[in-house]
Amino acid sequence: MKIVAFTLVAFVALAGASCPYAAPAAAYPAPVAPSGYPAPPCPTNYLFSCQPNLAPAPCAQEAPAYGSAGAYTEQVPHYVGNPSREQVQQFHQRIGMAALMEELRGLGQGIQGQQY
C-alpha cells in the first residue's frame, strides 16, 4: 500500500514539475462602466417630493423645552415587582394542573385509539 501511495505522489510531483505554471484565466471580463439604475425624476404632483421643505408650518407651535420626560405625553410605564409567595404558589398550581390535564388528555386519546 505504501508503494502505491509513493508511486502516486511521485507521479503527481513529476507531472506538476513538467507543466509550466499558468495563472488561471478570468472567469468573466470586468465591466467597463459601473452598472446601476438611473435615479427616477423627482415627482411634482405628490404630497411629498424629493426636495425637502424646511420652512415651518404657519400653525406650528414652538417646540417645548424637553425635560427628563422628553416629548412623551403618556405616563412612564411601571414594571411589576416580585410576586408574593401566595402568587407564586398559585402560579405553580396552575402550571401543575395544566400539565396534569394535558397528560390526561393524551391518555384519553391513547385509550380511544386502541383496538380491542
UniProtKB/Swiss-Prot annotation:
Keyword Iron: no
Domain of life, per lineage: Eukaryota
Keyword Calcium listed: no
GO process annotations (BP): vitelline membrane formation involved in chorion-containing eggshell formation
UniProtKB keywords: Secreted, Signal
PROSITE patterns found in the cross-reference section: VM (PS51137)
Domain VM: 36-73
Signal peptide stretch: 1-17
GO CC terms, sorted: extracellular space
GO molecular function: structural constituent of vitelline membrane
Function summary: Major early eggshell protein.
Protein name: Vitelline membrane protein Vm32E
Origin species: Drosophila santomea
